[in-house]
């Protein structure tokens, strides 16, 4: 592939060279401007910022004036359609004003970049900078120790504290950093090697884009970097009167956090930006909002956020009522027993396989070997045996033989097992023998799901009364629900015991199960495995099993960052994923040349047969390198391997530091020491990324930092990150990867070819192979994994895009309700849509009586047309007349409500004994009641109109939030059930899109009807004593924030199979699904989603079935 790329470069040219060449004229302009700026005084240099802001303001002044005039104009417009037109004009003008701002920023870019470079230069060359004190200087001096006021002057020091460490400014931007800054401003990804100063590069586009006053966000992967970088770079911006803050320094939903977002430049972690967005979209008052519009974001380590985190959405959830009902503790002893029995069985198969293979009987030996592998693939003895000559090849040959013809022969292998593990797909399945063992000491059908269709047919043949039939069916559905949940719990426990290992996939800290990020080796604080798996691991580890939760709000980081008008990113390793970043995010990757040439030596991989040989060789190499005075950084892929190597080094009396998920708080300190002579540091999966390892002159003379990789990662990019720790800024260094046939990557994807070559060469234990051909073979295996992962991520994003478009609609409606500006327009549209639904439904059946009934029921109005007109008029004409009548009634009702409420409000307001600021007013529609909080003074001054407006806002928010919560649950259920379409040769994504649209339309229709019905029927209290003081505007709810793991398509489909059912996968959380209001004794029709069978029974009996999710209500 590299050969083809080289040929293409000859004919087409090198993309990175072309990109850099296109930017060179801008760099030349910056260099020209530097000389003129160096002659300016400090005050004149600072005045440039005010000058730039004025240019931007004047460029967009015409558009801004028009926008302000239209906003004033719209307040006086009563006609809803005219209002909608004005709001559309405002939106267009705002877009045009943004484009003018961007054009102006491009024009002032060279001078603005030159200003920041000159500022950096002056801070480096002067211990103190004395300027005329401004109001901003005086404000900052109260909290910043590096600014001192002396009379009318402000003295800025060039030393300050960043993340607890005293630093003296010593950096000036290189030309390559100016190129990186231009790339970031253009909304692209700047790939710069480690040590090339990405943090300093960001100061250029941050300053330029902050000049608009719309806010700029710098996003980091952890809070240490966010706090450190914001403190480290702040004086550079504050010197020019720009405010800098970090959201991670302040509590969520606080005034301080809102102030941080109001700053010109805001630093923070990706998670906190995302969670703040979700919290804002659960707020019930504009005062609770913290974020502004999403203007421009620069994402540090952009590959980590947009690629590694692609399967982890941010979730805000709340506890489920009865959500703690699980059988993990009860079923755990059974699973432990089953796993122990299978372990003995697997060891027996392995012993037998070894004997048969030794005797030359490879056919039967291969059969027993395959059994041992499908019983326990992570068995250490099995992994060691597979590294021996020819054994891995025999296993794969046998597996291919039994998997041929759609796994036709595989049951012969599995019949002796109690459960089967397919490690590649992360799946475990109980066999009949396993169910038999599990069912000991229980009834025979303890783990067997009843066949609903057959059982219902049997009950109906029993000549029972309707009541008795209903009771029998109710028992059947309860039995089905309990058992399907039990089987799911069982499967998750089995996974916890066989596929998830402590100190590899997770660690135990403070008696809690904490997930370890496989990409970075850091703890994913607050993240839980979904679907009961986390609870299963908690049961396995004997810690408290946390309650099940229900999703209230969710967003993927990818879709959050796509909301920004402009997005850019920085990383040292993106070029291997350039195709994915362009295809999914339309982000171009530009490779920035290094300031100095690279002198690191990257050696070919050393390949061993077994892990033991590999680790022994690693330790020997580390001892030699350390004794020669070179610092050594050992990269591992898990906490377990880190601790193993640590024990081996202790045995050799080699002092060392360990940096992994358990020690992430000491990260920066350990990384800083990693460049000292002879220091050995073990780091799990690039923990410590983002902190420089600086080398002394002594270390450089000895050969620089030595990187030792103990295993190849699934992704070439992560290996490049590890290599990139050495050789920064032209420093010497070396990198060497050690690989064994027992490593995960080799075991699952790449070892057959390598094993054959090693067998052919007759390599004995302890001998090693090192050749460029072998390294390329390993990289091909990595590429295969990357392609699989890309496919999965792209597919997941396509699913999330469906949810994202729905989220935008719902959150837009929430925002309108929250701010109130466009709420009247939304209510008018809801009113029209409700009228349209009522007309269409009844016009289709020609049912005038029901049309009249629905108008009274939902809108409290009588029909505006006669029966003859109803039959004669078209749907559009009828909807128009109905809407006009409803609108007139609603306007009159609002005037009446305000008029009736005002005397009560006046009495409360004018009562000298009351000092209320806010009051609670209860509203009711006869069924539900809602407490509306309103500002007493505003309600009094508007003569009751403010109360009506608050009523509209509160009811809209309450109903939208409730409907959205239920909709999220339904979407989750549907995403799992549509995967079964693959069995019918249909694309699940297309079905998901179609069904999601139907679900969403139904939800919106439901919201419209419910909101309008309450607004039309909601009555004010007639008594003053119903009104109370609102001491707290809103009770803060106990939400849980987490990052969750999205499963790929195969895993979801397997889940359905595990539970022994095909349409509905039962999750441990039991949420009551949304249904129309029906009396319990009403007769309803329901349909089985699996076989289409229709039943007619009383709603109280049907409700259990509907809750189980295997049946749906059939609308008449």
UniProtKB/Swiss-Prot annotation:
Documented EC number(s): 7.4.2.8
Q: Which GO BP terms sit in this record?
A: intracellular protein transmembrane transport; protein import; protein targeting; protein transport by the Sec complex
| Entries under SUPFAM superfamilies matching the protein | Helical scaffold and wing domains of SecA, P-loop containing nucleoside triphosphate hydrolases, Pre-protein crosslinking domain of SecA
Task: Please verify whether the record's keywords include Isomerase.
Answer: no
Tell me where on the tree of life, at the top rank, the source sits.
Bacteria
State the Gene Ontology terms under molecular function: ATP binding; protein-exporting ATPase activity
**Compartment annotation:** Cell inner membrane; Cytoplasm
Q: Which residues form a coiled coil?
A: none
Keywords in alphabetical order? ATP-binding, Cell inner membrane, Cell membrane, Cytoplasm, Membrane, Nucleotide-binding, Protein transport, Translocase, Translocation, Transport
Residues given in the record as ATP binding sites: 177, 195-199, 692
An example GO CC term for this entry is: cell envelope Sec protein transport complex
Q: How does it sit in the membrane?
A: Peripheral membrane protein
Q: Which reaction does it catalyse?
A: ATP + H2O + cellular proteinSide 1 = ADP + phosphate + cellular proteinSide 2
PROSITE patterns in the cross-refs: SECA (PS01312), SECA_MOTOR_DEAD (PS51196)
Specify where it is mainly localized.
membrane
List the NCBIfam families: PRK12901.1 (NF009536)
Indicate the family of this protein.
Answer: Belongs to the SecA family.
Q: What does this protein do?
A: Part of the Sec protein translocase complex. Interacts with the SecYEG preprotein conducting channel. Has a central role in coupling the hydrolysis of ATP to the transfer of proteins into and across the cell membrane, serving as an ATP-driven molecular motor driving the stepwise translocation of polypeptide chains across the membrane.
- HAMAP family in the record, alphabetically? SecA (MF_01382)
Provide the assembly information.
Answer: Monomer and homodimer. Part of the essential Sec protein translocation apparatus which comprises SecA, SecYEG and auxiliary proteins SecDF. Other proteins may also be involved.
- Please give the name of this protein: Protein translocase subunit SecA
Please name the taxonomic classification of the source: Bacteria, Pseudomonadati, Bacteroidota, Flavobacteriia, Flavobacteriales
